UniProtKB/Swiss-Prot annotation:
Upper taxonomic lineage: Bacteria, Bacillati, Cyanobacteriota, Cyanophyceae, Acaryochloridales
GO biological process annotation, one example: nucleotide-excision repair
Record protein name field: UvrABC system protein C
PANTHER family according to UniProt: UVRABC SYSTEM PROTEIN C, UVRC/OXIDOREDUCTASE
HAMAP family attached to this UniProt entry: UvrC (MF_00203)
Entries under Gene3D superfamilies matching the protein: 5' to 3' exonuclease, C-terminal subdomain, GIY-YIG endonuclease, UVR domain, UvrC, RNAse H endonuclease domain
Family the entry assigns: Belongs to the UvrC family.
Pfam families: GIY-YIG, HHH_2, UVR, UvrC_RNaseH, UvrC_RNaseH_dom
Residue intervals of the UVR domain: 215-250
Quaternary structure, from the entry: Interacts with UvrB in an incision complex.
Function: The UvrABC repair system catalyzes the recognition and processing of DNA lesions. UvrC both incises the 5' and 3' sides of the lesion. The N-terminal half is responsible for the 3' incision and the C-terminal half is responsible for the 5' incision.
């Protein structure tokens, strides 16, 4: 179905566009928009595919900026026909979850809202709080994002006190469990003192709490407690009693007065300006507010109803059927209320209603959710204004032609030349963009233990960063997403001069804005200036540069520590070809130390399982060079 990839978009090739649009039938289904690299830009669904896809290419200037940008990148269109619109919605949700197209990511990656992660992909899953969803492992489950991080931490702390769960990312000891096992906080997963099946049964109970099913869990535990008492297993009954008592305290101060406490319901509302929509979703179970989720969405993606529709599709599309509420209260009518309700009802296998309440208690609940969304929007606007002020001040301070969109900062870390590394951190629009961070190992042979050279190290790293533009002069520079509007060097005049000399050799220095920030007096140096820039250390632009430098310093130190630890853990046996980790363990088990291995003869070495005559001779020759 897909033509050969062309560098010309469909939009510019009108004949090809018309031919492709005629191939699309007026039936329900899902459509894919691909760019010139064959990457999926967007996945959508429609009751009539042809009409929906055609609408993107009519009066493009009237589309929101995000959609207009996407349309200009479309090089091909594919489609899948379905029998019904509901099937198209279900297929769209699965495909978006699988491919994560750039223009489908309506929800912004906002780090202030944390998730709870359960790593079902592991034999003994962990449960922990994180601010980043990792999409690599489909089995792992995320709950959230939660607005009240303090309440989330309190709940998780209570859960870990009531249920024995894996506490550590890595075992503390190789041959015995740690103190958490002794005090009953962990079932000894590091030593496999509990089977994976039994451990997962415990974790399934814990997950019910974060699915809003605490009442159901309490009922289950109560039945188990009664059965344990009947079996005269009083210790188990007492443990279950304590768990029930602890769980009954969850949410007691968050009672929401609604007419039917038995119905599970969610209430969702938003507040928006011309850029951002702050969405709040309250989860109410048995009349209690058990979860408060927050989302940041692109306000230019459509009407308020359309934004709510997309948020609900994204949120419920990744939820388990058991987590879906029976009633969803919305702030405003959705464009496709019946379709979404039908889709959720099919997944839940029970009727799910979506209503926009106008009177009485439910309307008051929506007003409360909307009020919370307005508070979140005000906080977001304040933070955004503070960042914008810092960028404006920095542009004025450095006489930049426009506000710096992408700022890069570089730092070096080592101990007297050993394990020398460098960091590159990136701020986009004044905020950390960790997906663009980079680490470098210093390759300069003159930089080694006992001999450091920060000037040469920085020159090397900046040369490696920008040499691709020297090798490919036709490659676009300024105005592209990968080209920095400002480069910051951690250091003084000497470091700046070394970097400028290196970049001059590869003919990129003329297109870069470069400064350095000296540590001691927080002085800013510019190319060609012998004296530092006169600044006030408290002005917003300077504080932004200092935050950037501190982040580069932190990132460099963390990488240096990692490399140093790897070197310290490295065994001399690692240098022997053919001697892998398993064989090293066999040798150390037989001889107890490297000193004894060094003293062993080839005959003694080959007596160890998995060590043949040739490898035994290699090991002997390594320790006894001619």
């Amino acid at each position: 179905m897909t033509d050969a990839v062309s560098t010309t978009t469909l939009l510019k090739d009108r004949d090809r566009l018309e031919a492709r649009l005629k191939e699309i039938p007026p039936e329900p289904g899902v459509y894919f928009m691909r760019d010139a690299n064959d990457d999926i830009l967007y996945i959508g669904k429609s009751k009539k595919l042809r009409n929906r896809v055609r609408s993107y290419f009519r009066q493009i200037q009237d589309h929101p900026p995000r959609i207009e940008l996407m349309v200009h990148q479309v090089a091909d269109i594919e489609f899948i026909v379905t029998d019904t619109e509901a099937e198209a919605l279900a297929l769209e949700a699965n495909l978006i979850k699988q491919h994560q197209p750039h223009f489908n990511v309506l929800l912004k990656d906002d780090k202030k809202y944390p998730y709870l992660c359960v790593t079902w992909s592991q034999t003994y899953p962990r449960i922990f709080i994180t601010r980043k969803r990792r999409l690599g492992k489909a089995q792992d489950k995320y709950y959230g994002p939660y607005v009240d991080v303090w309440q989330l931490r309190q709940t998780l702390r209570l859960v870990k006190r009531l249920f024995p769960l894996r506490q550590r990312r890595k075992p503390l000891f190789k041959d015995r469990p740690c103190l958490n096992y002794e005090i009953g906080r962990c079932p000894g997963v590091c030593q496999a003192l509990i089977t994976p099946e039994a451990y997962r049964q415990i974790l399934q109970k814990v997950v019910m709490i974060f699915q809003g099913r605490t009442s159901e869990l309490i009922n289950t535990l109560s039945l188990q407690m009664e059965q344990a008492a009947e079996d005269l297993n009083f210790e188990q009954a007492a443990r279950l009693r304590d768990q029930i008592k602890g769980l009954q305290g969850l949410g007691v101060d968050q009672k929401v007065a609604l007419p039917d406490d038995t119905v599970s319901r969610d209430a969702i509302a938003l507040a928006a300006d011309d850029q951002i929509a702050c969405v709040q979703l309250f989860q109410i179970r048995s009349g209690r507010l058990v979860g408060r989720l927050g989302f940041m969405a692109d306000a230019q993606s459509g009407s308020l109803g359309m934004i709510l529709q997309h948020v609900l599709e994204a949120h419920y599309g990744s939820a388990e059927p058991v987590e879906l509420p029976l009633e969803i209260l919305v702030q405003t009518e959705l464009p496709e209320t019946e379709l979404l309700a039908s889709y959720l009802s099919q997944r839940k296998e029970r009727k799910v209603s979506i209503t926009c309440p106008q009177r009485q208690i439910k309307a008051e609940l929506i007003e409360m959710v909307e009020r919370n969304a307005q508070y979140e929007l005000a906080r977001t606007q304040k933070s955004r204004d503070r960042t914008l002020n810092a960028l404006q001040d920095l542009a004025e301070l450095l006489d930049l032609p426009e506000l710096p969109h992408r700022i890069e900062c570089y730092d070096i870390s080592h101990i007297q030349g050993s394990d020398a590394v460098a960091s590159q951190v990136v701020f986009i629009d004044g905020l950390p963009a960790k997906q663009h961070y980079r680490r470098y190992k210093i390759r300069n042979p003159n930089v080694k233990a006992g001999h450091s050279d920060d000037f040469a190290s920085l020159a090397e790293v900046l040369h490696r960063r920008f040499r691709q533009y020297h090798l490919s002069p036709e490659q676009p520079r300024q105005g592209t997403s990968d080209w920095p509007d400002l480069v910051v060097i951690d250091g003084g005049k000497g470091q700046l001069s070394a970097v400028l000399e290196s970049l001059t050799k590869i003919e990129v220095v003329e297109d870069l804005q470069i400064i350095s920030l000296a540590k001691q007096r927080e002085e800013i140096f510019q190319p060609g200036e012998s004296q530092p820039l006169p600044t006030d250390p408290e002005q917003p632009g300077v504080q932004l540069i200092r935050r950037l430098r501190d982040e580069a310093h932190r990132f460099a130190i963390s990488f240096h520590r990692k490399k140093r630890l790897e070197r310290m853990r490295r065994s001399r046996l690692d240098d022997i070809p053919g001697l892998g980790h398993h064989r090293q363990k066999e040798l150390l088990a037989a001889f107890r130390s490297i000193d004894y291995i060094r003293e062993a003869s080839p005959e003694q070495l080959k007596a160890v399982p998995t060590i043949g005559p040739q490898l035994a001779q290699k090991i002997y020759d390594y320790f006894h060079p001619a």
